[in-house]
């Protein structure tokens, strides 16, 4: 009786959250297992009964594990330092796929454990970068919000997953001015973990070195022997606040990037001279948004036209052709996001590789399971 009440409460709770599909899936699992268990009890041969029961239990446990990893929760390893001081290389994070709704598999390679059989098949392996099925996503409990940190696949490859922070939503206009991000003309309040390169003048050297030793950030410091009272380093907002409160530095100046990154590696328009710290304005594509086809828009969005929108757009003498038809405008099929790493000078993000399509979003980071912070 208590078990039935608990199950009913769980199913009702999931329905209230809008997860009808999960409630139905759990109910289907329970009903199927109950029916099979009923027929197993009718078997008179004890050894056969135990064998079949063990096989059924194993298959249900395996199915539950596959279902959970594919649609509910999964574990990922942080591959780089792009999100320091929030995550560190080698950290194991728990990713919640229910937040934005789980993306359904687009090929057998997206299905845990089942994909092992396809990795050993040469014909299937030749199609590992292809989408076998159309993009679909089940209902989630919320939408992506500015400031969310989530895991996504960087391109159509199924081997490379990264984690970044969302600073721009579909339809937003993003502008970066002297390293500060503005969304729709409003300054984005970066979290305390965001790191930037700074120059600063020391007021109290002894206290300064004591503090940076406690913060374990001495390896980030660079000293100028010709100016002994000046130093530079990579600090998070939180670390800078500590240094300022302790009254050991006199002034701070953020290092602004001036064409230190080749233009070919950045988002750009026809006449832009954008840098990592000065860029935009950039309109993030939104599903149904229509743009004029002109040299600036073509240069800014051409990667996603062909790679994610599955539209072949060709420019000939100032005239644009979409799938062979002459057009003057284009309507986007997907929503896109603008992603940035918290380690602003130690990350490759949307400033270089462009916009992230919603179809590549895996799930929101829920927590850190194992941390390498002090290793």
Task: Locate the predicted segments by residue.
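Extended hydrophobic leader/signal-anchor segments used for secretion and membrane insertion
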Residues: 1-375
């Amino acid at each position: 009786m208590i078990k039935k009440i608990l199950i009913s409460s769980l199913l009702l709770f999931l329905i209230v959250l809008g997860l009808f599909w999960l409630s139905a899936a759990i109910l289907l699992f329970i009903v199927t297992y109950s029916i099979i268990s009923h027929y197993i009890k009718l078997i008179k041969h004890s050894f056969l009964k135990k064998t079949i029961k063990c096989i059924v239990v194993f298959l249900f446990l395996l199915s539950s594990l596959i279902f959970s990893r594919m649609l509910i929760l999964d574990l990922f390893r942080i591959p780089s330092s792009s999100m320091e001081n929030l995550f560190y290389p080698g950290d194991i994070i728990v990713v919640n796929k229910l937040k934005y709704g789980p993306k359904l598999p687009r090929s057998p390679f997206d299905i845990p454990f089942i994909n092992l059989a396809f990795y050993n098949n040469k014909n299937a392996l030749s199609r590992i970068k292809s989408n076998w099925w159309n993009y679909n996503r089940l209902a989630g409990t919320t939408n992506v919000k500015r400031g969310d940190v989530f895991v996504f696949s960087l391109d159509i490859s199924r081997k490379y997953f990264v984690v970044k922070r969302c600073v721009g939503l579909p339809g937003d206009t993003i502008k970066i001015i002297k390293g500060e991000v503005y969304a729709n003309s409003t300054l984005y309040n970066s979290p305390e973990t965001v790191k930037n390169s700074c120059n600063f003048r020391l007021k109290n050297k002894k206290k300064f070195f004591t503090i940076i030793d406690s913060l374990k950030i001495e390896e980030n410091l660079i000293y100028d022997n010709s100016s002994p009272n000046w130093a530079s380093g990579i600090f998070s907002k939180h670390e800078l606040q500590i240094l300022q409160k302790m009254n050991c530095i006199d002034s701070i100046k953020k290092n602004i990037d001036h064409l230190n990154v080749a233009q070919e590696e950045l988002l750009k328009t026809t006449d832009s001279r954008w840098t990592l710290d000065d860029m935009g304005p950039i309109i993030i594509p939104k599903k149904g948004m229509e743009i004029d086809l002109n040299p600036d828009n073509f240069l800014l969005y051409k990667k996603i036209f062909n790679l994610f929108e599955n539209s072949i757009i060709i420019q000939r003498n100032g005239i644009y052709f979409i799938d062979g038809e002459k057009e003057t405008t284009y309507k986007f099929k997907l929503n896109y996001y603008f992603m940035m790493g918290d380690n602003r000078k130690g990350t490759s993000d949307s400033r270089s590789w462009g916009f992230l399509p919603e179809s590549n979003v895996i799930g929101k980071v829920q927590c850190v399971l194992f941390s390498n912070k002090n290793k």
